[in-house]
Design a protein with these regions (language model features):
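Non-catalytic C-terminal accessory region of glycerolipid acyltransferases
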Residues: 2-29, 76, 97, 101, ...
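A short, well-structured juxtamembrane/interface segment
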Residues: 23-47, 65-66
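Conserved beta-strand termini and adjacent loop/short-helix elements that scaffold enzyme active sites
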Residues: 34-36, 83, 105-108, 190-192
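Short amphipathic alpha-helical segments and helix-helix/interface helices
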Residues: 39-40, 69, 92, 146-147
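Flexible, charged surface loops at secondary-structure boundaries
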Residues: 41-45, 72-75, 122-123
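Hydrophobic helix-cap positions at the C-terminus of alpha-helices
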Residues: 42-43, 67, 121, 216
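A generic secondary-structure signal marking the coil-to-beta-strand transition
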Residues: 46-49, 56, 183-185, 191
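Catalytic core of membrane glycerolipid acyltransferases/transacylases, capturing the structured
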Residues: 47-108
């Protein structure tokens, strides 16, 4: 009898483990939502560009999406920008396990291709999630992609903040945080922000958004 070789994909395996571990942890979390935008209770027509820091990925990918109005007729799901690296392979796999799509790209690799794909997805009505300081930092430094996309497509930006009351902070470039089981996590959704299509000084818009995200993060960060 012929034996068939079993194919083992390390990235897929790690992604499945990470996604299920995240689900398990968040099944015990006391989650508090502060929706200043009305996104959850009165979902808007058309997509939004969701922007949050890289070290808040667990809270947003599990906590926010627990309340995401996926059955509302205006929502067509969420896709996440992930790095075209081996770490990005794992993150894309985690997102897939959690029911999200992904677009592979970064400022240094596949940047223009990813922008075209992101624009096409936005125009199809999909909400897009971007961690503007990923995948390599600097921590709490907002890249220009979200601002550029918002101006190009006319689609508003929605800032997401997460506060962990008890978490493990990893020794990574961004002090990636993982909430402890049975702890509390607060997620705040800011009102929508639009970028003037005629604006020529996108740097001031970038700094405005970076400041809002950074100040909220530094106010709620736990010691590393």
């Amino acid at each position: 009898m012929a034996l068939h070789k079993i194919q083992f994909n390390k990235q897929e395996f790690l992604a499945a483990i990470a996604a299920n571990l995240a689900r398990l942890i968040f099944s015990t979390i006391r989650l508090r939502m502060n929706d200043r935008s009305g996104f959850l209770t009165s979902p808007p027509e058309g997509p939004r560009i969701l922007v949050f820091w890289h070290n808040r990925i667990p809270a947003i990918s599990i906590g926010f999406l627990r309340h995401y109005p996926r059955r509302h007729p205006t929502r067509k799901g969420v896709s996440v920008l992930t790095s075209p690296s081996k770490d990005g392979d794992i993150l894309a796999g985690v997102m897939a396990n959690l029911g999200m799509g992904s677009v592979r790209g970064s400022s240094s690799r596949r940047g223009s291709t990813a922008i075209r794909e992101l624009t096409a997805l936005l125009e199809s009505g999909v909400d897009l999630a971007i961690t503007p300081d990923g995948p390599r930092g600097p921590k709490y430094s907002l890249g220009p992609g979200a601002v550029f996309l918002s101006q190009k497509t006319g689609i508003p930006i929605m800032l997401l903040h997460a506060r962990y009351h008890n978490a493990i902070r990893l020794k990574t470039w961004d002090n990636f945080a993982i909430p402890l089981p049975f702890s509390r996590v607060d997620i705040t959704i800011d009102p929508y922000m639009t970028i003037d299509p005629e604006a020529t000084d996108l740097e001031s818009e970038r700094l405005r958004i970076e400041t809002l995200l950074r100040e909220e993060a530094e106010k709620t960060d736990l010691p590393a």
